[in-house]
């Protein structure tokens, strides 16, 4: 069984200290008094322990931001999701928020416009995040597009689209898969999708003014031809008004951003996304952007990039020193 993770704003500071000094902090019970959620794929009947951060000094790394460039494309006015390509070095995939045509855009890390890829067979009600992950063909990386926005909490179901990662110069990609998702607790607002690059497991993080962020999971081996109810994992308490606006998962690190901070977890070898989110995150101060929602990890986890909504916004690079 997996306990809900509740990290009050002040408590996170002590968790970061514990992580850097080798201490271990245990997650608290669900703040809403709910039952203990079940970890996906776990047959254990005992709570999963919170583990210490594995890399010495991880929380003490100086994550210094620098402007890598500016977004050139005049079509990118409401960037909400980002993903760094593993196959095409230096390519960043971006997409717009609600009200835009279904399309993804390729830039390089300096913001140079490399092309627009239209996706005419997919719907785009409120795309909020994107991720790179595995799919049916093990030799191919896939772009996951999270149509999970629901400001009014009125959507009975949301969608996650998946396409093979295209070449940046291709203008149209037809087809694609769509996974229809429901939540066990009813409609939620969400802007964060994490996809495990190892097995395609997915975690959706909700968004709330309280900062209490519900987490839901979907197994990577689901049949995408039928709807699925996500599994409730628990919650993160990021602090009042700390809204989860985007995230990314790699083989060594996981990040979830708010408008002001980035919460970063280091992954132990073989750990699942759910297990990783039980460990202590580090808090990294983000540059206050116009409306910062997108974040993307580099393939090796050594750096991440953020970018905001708005025309010709800067691309910020955070590299560990």
What are the residue ranges of the model-derived segments?
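Sec-dependent, cleavable N-terminal signal peptides
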Residues: 11-14
